[in-house]
């Protein structure tokens, strides 16, 4: 049975633990006729059967997204011989030359001529064969330079970070930095704008690092392709601040993404990705033209990776993918957009009217098509954009973590298909906080499969492969950009282990005033924070459970046993961030003598809508004294729970917005006789969460206070 794709809410929930999907798997068979395949957008069905032309998407199967095409398994030497034999038999006239300067002689045509429209057929043949099949099998218009090609290649590249990073890096310095990456990093800290600060880390190779880089006022100050510069949107203060890190090819972890700045951030990284892809493409075309004019074989030009895909963008939903594509087409408008209608039919949907009362962050994430199972190849030619191109023929791959993992993994113990990720030079992870609510294991799995040595050649011309790829050092030149609403231990682990860029990395975070100060309630709420000792993160779950049952639950149980029309501890909401902790607490309530007389309800991310409605109704009416509620359930549903008089937080929420949502549940108790209370459990391993709730100024004293372990705010 094929994987079912639904629009608007069909896939909200955690991803599969193993990353495997039900149904047919991706296979790597490819069409025999390359021209026919490319003209139809390079689309291949999930089971490996070619589809019809996808320009008209009516009646197409949504599950048939971009596959992993397998180029012919022939080595570059035999390909070169075939090309030479073809040239020897050719009776075509000599290729025309066009001089740039009118008075310049023909003595040195290599320096004065550039490819012209008359060279199209031969240029296509050379670029397709000598420049490797991985850079594209298509022989139409995409090996012809852009209109602004001559102007771009004549630009001084000394201040172009693309040239410094990927064009002509100093081999000795590069080797020294790669060795330093595995030893020690030197970090510096600096304040930025609007409460932001940066921590920049550089390989300790004797250089000087700076945490605060000069801002970039506008796109005109960047070394952009001319066509991109004409359509680039203006920079606000935040973009001007981030541009030096992003366009300077630093790895960047940005932990202050909001609904207000998300569109500007998306335009910024899309501009950077397009600039990188187009400059890479122009360099390959330029060098292919040089090689086609040189017959002595002495020229060595290394400008490629093992495979064509250069940019990987990881997103939470299909609608997020639509927004990225819209940014691409806004910055780089093209009249021809193959398979655009099919893409919009498969990926875009209207917002649900039922969510009009939901908060803005919820509508941004789940608005439109919130399916979290997708993958898409995206390809540029001189005249068109091609959707649903095969991975090995794509420039950019956009995917959800679950969708990409199912493309990598193979059934029956076969080797994973990850060669198409071997030459990724830029990874962009947007809305990372939402990806953690799906299944972060999928993201870690994807990073573990990046920049590995390919198992097969895939038609690669190894004479054009950059030396650092051959040496297995691709990960040290890959740029990783991660955008999240807040920082977490998982993101810190990704930053420390997977961001190994020799040009350095930057972590940009916010200083917090504290979510507990921004409550909108007509009554005062007593907020008590209880600190417990925990020896290590591994032992933290056990220490938390013991403290909860022996201290917090024991005091609540006394209130539940008192006789009154509504028990003193009735209306208690117990918020539990982790599902594993939720299961443990649920079992304790079901089996322990401590809670044998307590009626309780359950709402987790796996609870059906019907059962959730019943549990909320019983809790509001007093039939349930306690309601156990998980963070993921709140993330995916944003229930408005009534009847709450007390809140116990088994752990702090990752998202500070959830703190305000939960405290506002107490508004229904405004007419009661007792003051609503909030009690929170935390340990020293909750420092990042605690900072967002109590504020940067208070968190240190609460973690290190020697005089007591209880802190109360009213």
Swiss-Prot record:
Basic and acidic residues biased stretches: 24-38
Disulfide bond sites: none
Primary residence: nucleus
Span list, region Disordered: 1-145
Keywords assigned: Nucleus, Ribonucleoprotein, Ribosome biogenesis, rRNA processing
Record's GO cellular component terms: nucleolus; small-subunit processome
Gene Ontology biological process: maturation of SSU-rRNA from tricistronic rRNA transcript (SSU-rRNA, 5.8S rRNA, LSU-rRNA)
Single Gene Ontology MF annotation: U3 snoRNA binding
Biased composition (Acidic residues): 118-145
Annotated InterPro entries: P-loop_NTPase, UTP25, UTP25_C, UTP25_NTPase-like
Top-level taxonomic group: Eukaryota
Subcellular location: Nucleus, Nucleolus
Residues annotated as transmembrane: none
Biased composition (Basic residues): 1-23
Subunit structure: Component of the ribosomal small subunit (SSU) processome composed of at least 40 protein subunits and snoRNA U3.
Family statement: Belongs to the UTP25 family.
Main function: DEAD-box RNA helicase-like protein required for pre-18S rRNA processing, specifically at sites A0, A1, and A2.
Name of this protein: U3 small nucleolar RNA-associated protein 25
């Amino acid at each position: 049975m094929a994987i079912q794709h639904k629009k608007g809410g069909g896939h909200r929930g955690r991803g599969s633990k193993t990353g495997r999907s039900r149904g047919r798997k991706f296979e790597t068979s490819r069409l025999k006729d390359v021209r026919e395949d490319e003209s139809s957008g390079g689309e291949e069905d999930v089971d490996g059967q070619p589809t019809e032309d996808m320009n008209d998407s009516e009646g197409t199967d949504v599950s048939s997204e971009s596959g992993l095409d397998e180029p012919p398994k022939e080595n570059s030497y035999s390909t070169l011989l075939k090309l030479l034999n073809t040239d020897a038999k050719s009776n075509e006239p000599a290729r025309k030359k066009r001089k740039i300067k009118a008075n310049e002689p023909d003595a040195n045509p290599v320096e004065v001529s550039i490819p012209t429209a008359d060279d199209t057929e031969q240029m296509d043949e050379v670029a397709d064969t000598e420049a490797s099949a991985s850079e594209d099998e298509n022989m139409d218009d995409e090996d012809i330079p852009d209109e602004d090609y001559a102007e771009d290649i004549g630009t001084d590249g000394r201040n172009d970070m693309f040239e410094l990073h990927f064009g002509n890096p100093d081999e000795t310095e590069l080797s020294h930095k790669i060795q330093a990456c595995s030893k020690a990093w030197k970090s510096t800290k600096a304040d930025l704008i609007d409460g932001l600060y940066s921590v920049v880390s550089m390989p300790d190779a004797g250089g000087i690092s700076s945490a605060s880089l000069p801002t970039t006022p506008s796109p005109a100050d960047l070394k952009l392709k001319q066509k991109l510069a004409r359509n680039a949107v203006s920079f606000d203060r935040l973009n001007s601040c981030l541009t030096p890190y992003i366009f300077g090819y630093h790895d960047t972890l940005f932990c202050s993404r909001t609904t207000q700045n998300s569109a500007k951030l998306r335009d910024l990284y899309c501009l950077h990705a397009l600039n990188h892809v187009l400059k890479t493409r122009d360099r390959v075309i330029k060098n292919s033209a040089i090689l086609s004019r040189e017959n002595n074989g002495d020229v060595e030009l290394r400008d490629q990776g093992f495979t064509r895909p250069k940019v990987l963008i990881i997103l939470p939903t299909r609608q997020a993918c639509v927004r990225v594509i819209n940014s691409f087409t806004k910055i780089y408008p093209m009249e021809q957009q193959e398979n655009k209608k099919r893409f919009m039919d498969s990926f875009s949907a209207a917002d649900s009217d039922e969510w009009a009362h939901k908060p803005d962050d919820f509508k941004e994430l789940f608005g439109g098509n919130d399916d979290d199972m997708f993958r898409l190849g995206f390809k540029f030619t001189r005249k068109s954009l091609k959707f649903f191109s095969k991975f090995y023929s794509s420039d950019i791959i956009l995917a959800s973590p679950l969708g990409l993992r199912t493309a990598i993994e193979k059934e029956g113990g076969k080797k994973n298909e990850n060669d198409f990720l071997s030459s990724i030079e830029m990874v962009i992870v947007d809305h990372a906080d939402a990806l953690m609510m799906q299944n972060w294991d999928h993201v870690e799995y994807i990073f573990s499969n990046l920049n590995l040595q390919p198992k097969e050649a895939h038609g690669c011309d190894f004479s054009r492969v950059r030396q650092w790829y051959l040496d297995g050092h691709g990960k040290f030149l890959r740029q990783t950009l991660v955008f999240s609403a807040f920082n977490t231990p998982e993101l810190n682990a990704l930053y420390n282990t997977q961001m190994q860029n020799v040009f350095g990395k930057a972590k940009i975070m916010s200083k917090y005033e504290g979510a507990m100060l921004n409550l909108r309630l007509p009554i005062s709420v007593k907020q008590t924070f209880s600190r417990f000792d925990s020896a290590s993160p591994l032992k933290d779950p056990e220490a938390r459970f013991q403290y909860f049952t022996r201290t917090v639950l024991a005091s609540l149980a006394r209130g539940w046993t008192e006789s009154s029309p509504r028990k003193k501890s009735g209306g208690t909401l117990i918020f539990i961030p982790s599902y594993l902790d939720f299961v443990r607490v649920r079992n304790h309530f079901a089996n322990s003598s401590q809670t044998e007389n307590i009626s309780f309800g359950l709402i987790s991310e796996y609870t059906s809508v019907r059962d959730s409605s019943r549990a909320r109704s019983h809790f509001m009416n007093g039939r349930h004294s306690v309601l156990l509620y998980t963070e993921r359930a709140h993330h995916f549903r944003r229930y408005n729970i009534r009847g709450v008089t007390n809140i116990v937080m088994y752990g702090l929420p990752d998202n500070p917005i959830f703190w305000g949502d939960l405290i506002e549940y107490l508004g229904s108790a405004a007419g009661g006789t007792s003051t609503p209370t909030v009690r929170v459990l935390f340990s020293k391993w909750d420092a990042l969460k605690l900072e967002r709730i109590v504020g940067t100024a208070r968190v240190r004293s609460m973690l290190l206070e020697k005089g007591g372990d209880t802190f109360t705010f009213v």
